Amino acid sequence: MTVQAENTAPPRLINRELSWIELNARLLELAEDPSQPLLERVKFTAIVSSNFDEFFMVRVAGLLEQDEAAMGVRSVDGLTPGQALESIRVRVAELTARQSRLWKRDLRPALAAHDIEVVSLKDCSERELKRLEAYFERDIYPILTPLAVGAGQPFPYISGLSLSLCVTAVDPETGEERFARVKVPEGLDRFVSVGKRLVLLESVIGHFLPVLFPGMDVTERAYFRVTRDADFDVSDDADDLLEAVESELRRRRFGDVVRLELSASASQAMRDRLIEGLGVRPTQVYDIEGPLDMADLWQLVSLDRPELKDEPWVPVVPPRWARMKSPTRVFDEIRRGDMIVHLPYDSFRASFEAFAQGAAHDPDVIAMKTTVYRTSDDSMLTASLIECAEEGKQSVCLVELKARFDERRNIEMSRAMEQAGVHVVHGFADLKIHAKMTLVVRREEGGLRRYVHIGTGNYNAATARLYEDVGIFTADEDIAADVADLFNHITGFGRPQRFRKLLVAPFDMRSRILAEIDRVSVAAAAGKHARIRLKLNQIVDPVVIEALYAAGQAGAKIQICARAICMLRPGVPGLSENISVRSIFGRFLEHSRIYAFEAGEETTYLIGSADMMPRNLDRRIEVLVPIENARARQELAAVLDSTFSDTTNAWILAADGTWSRDVASGAKAHPHQLTMMRRAQQRARRGDRGR
């Protein structure tokens, strides 16, 4: 039964899932923006599709489980699972229809105008069809397997996110109608070249279907795609975490179907067959007018057409790093004073990877410990850890096996490092290790000294070129001691009694964040300067949100930049009129977590891995580090000033949960990311000794 979604949510909170969907709406608006380079618009369109895939695999899957279990309990925003699902269905259908229209009416014609022509087979010449027929017979036909349904043949297993054709064929002699499924091969390019033009792979298969069904009349074909539940839980009692995760990965392949995407042209009979065979509700079916799975548009984005893309950005080598004659000099520089790095404006390779290489090459280094949540295949960090192990240094890597959709990569990386002699630790079954921290121990005059890096982003060279993040390199003794204690807690399961400077979840981070908010509230009530500025990915935690409401009511000015989910309602009279919320999108993904609490003349700056969500504060190992170095604090202040001044790629959240783009032109235009790029270049030209 379809549940009508009444808006019974209390005014204090915005629904989490609906807030996330609006992230995709903002991305789609960028894709629609004609001022963006054409292939960047195509890229944003592809990201919308891949984002929705993950959303259905995890969030919608969980809501369906709750709804099927008749769990009518309302979430903190006031919606039941059924109401949330109906609201999601309506909004996702709107956005996917808008995405299809964008492709058909705008992007595809614009690409054709630049000689990237994606055509249907009916527009192909006889010569082009001959070439496609040869390609089909040589490269496609040998790997196709039509699977009939009925007459003793069960409905076939359909793998998650795979693209398929459903086919109805009639025997001309008996009039018997048969139904079959043909999977589109995953190892072939989605866009097939035919001369200077491109056609979709599934349309080539659809055109030559009679070859697969000789002696039958193909009466209907349509394209479909299923999304399966991909979330999993590992038992807290698991003796071998790696083995338990591997077992769950095998099970995940057979998760329940949570979404069926289907060509809008499919007949009702074909639709009914798929609904019955896949065991889904009619409300889980999404009609698609254009191509299914637009995430494959990345193939077009990868074309060598620089004039249709953003001008390439070459990360700057920060001046203090540029002066180093060898990687081993990094420790001398850190001793001179903390160094902050702002990615991707600053170079990841010249900073963090140089730090890791320095640990591997320096004969005075005796130990290196790090955390890995997501990393790249060509990671210099893992190479440095292996080199440390081969040199007889203590080399420890805490690998989070439950990093969603990177589980397989992390398992393989763990085994490779273990075989090379690295001590690999997988942490806890019930707590993800999400902290980004590295500890290097060095033998120096006067004894051992520890060096630390703590950041907001993953140690991943690929994403470091695309994601905006910050990190600090320090030899502060208290911070280093805290990091060492935390590593020992994770590897040895001892419980730290207290932390000197770090805020660590799930131990004291929540209470200390609330204490910082309260400190600002007290200052506001006393008539002193009181401001909170939060730059993060998501703000979901109801307790933190209520504390922010209270601080705003006390008179504090609160500015929030949330990239994705924001359940806080800004601008509500009597509740949150002193709170403003924005979101910034551009060529780089805003990923850093920077927190500033200003009370009177005292300001606390924090950076780290944690968003303001219950999972980050209560169910993960997370770290926030206070920034005390004056130059580093100035840099963070500049980042926040620019963030909250953007008038080019900022969206503003209204009290009703809607977002609107804040666009200015001429002298009033302030593009945050471009400002940061110019700032990095100017700093490098000046040889700024503070960085």
Predicted regions: what is each one?
Residues 1-532, 550-554, 566-691:
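N-terminal localization/anchoring segments of enzymes in phospholipid and broader phosphate metabolism
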Residues 544:
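Polyanion-binding catalytic cores of nucleic-acid enzymes and NTP/SAM-utilizing transferases
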Residues 557-561:
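Hydrophobic alpha/beta core scaffold segments
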